[in-house]
Design a protein with these regions (language model features):
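N-terminal leader segment of winged-helix/HTH proteins
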Residues: 1-33
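C-terminal regulatory/oligomerization modules of transcriptional regulators
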Residues: 1-7, 127-149
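Short alpha-helical "packing" element that flanks the helix-turn-helix/winged-helix DNA-binding module
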Residues: 42-43
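Charged, amphipathic alpha-helical coiled-coil/dimerization segments
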Residues: 23, 54, 74-134
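A short acidic, leucine-rich amphipathic alpha-helix
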Residues: 57-59
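Short helix-capping/hinge SLiMs at alpha-helix to coil transitions
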Residues: 32-33, 47-50
Length: 149
């Protein structure tokens, strides 16, 4: 096997286990907040977004289909972290609004996530991290624009 194909195979083989390991690591860091990684990510994303985003936009940012975000939002809403309201411009759609508790929790989750990333990347050269980020972005673009063989 040519070296470039071996490197590509090695790189892609590591993506899923790395994502799973990172998720487990973040789950442990967020455990004290009594949120799953999915819930914490949704609350953090909502904290970063404009108040009153539509469910569909949150689903898109989470990388899931629209209906898949409903149980997650149910959980977040039951916890008192967010509320859904009818969209004033489209009564069929719902908008999501973080509560005060949701905004506070989003800030805590962001802080813990920042601490985790700082520790994980402390010994990695910034230039190497920039290259790795560019490579991941290029792979993502290639996946979006190419057909499977």
């Amino acid at each position: 096997m040519p070296d470039d194909l071996f490197l590509a195979r090695t790189f892609t083989t590591q993506l899923v286990p790395l994502a799973r390991a990172y998720r487990r690591h973040i789950d442990r860091a967020l455990a004290g907040l009594a949120l799953s990684h999915s819930s914490a990510l949704a609350v953090m994303l909502l904290g970063r977004m404009e108040d009153g985003v539509r469910q569909g936009l949150l689903a898109e940012q989470l990388g899931v289909e629209g209906p898949s975000v409903v149980p997650l939002l149910d959980q977040i809403e039951r916890a008192g972290l967010a509320e859904r309201r009818p969209d004033p411009t489209d009564k069929r759609a719902k908008t999501i609004h973080l509560t005060e508790a949701g905004r506070a929790l989003a800030a805590q989750a962001e802080e813990r996530s920042t601490q985790v990333r700082a520790a994980l990347f402390a010994d990695i050269d910034k230039g190497d991290l920039a290259v790795a980020t560019r490579v991941l972005e290029q792979v993502a673009r290639a996946l979006d624009t190419s057909d499977p063989v």
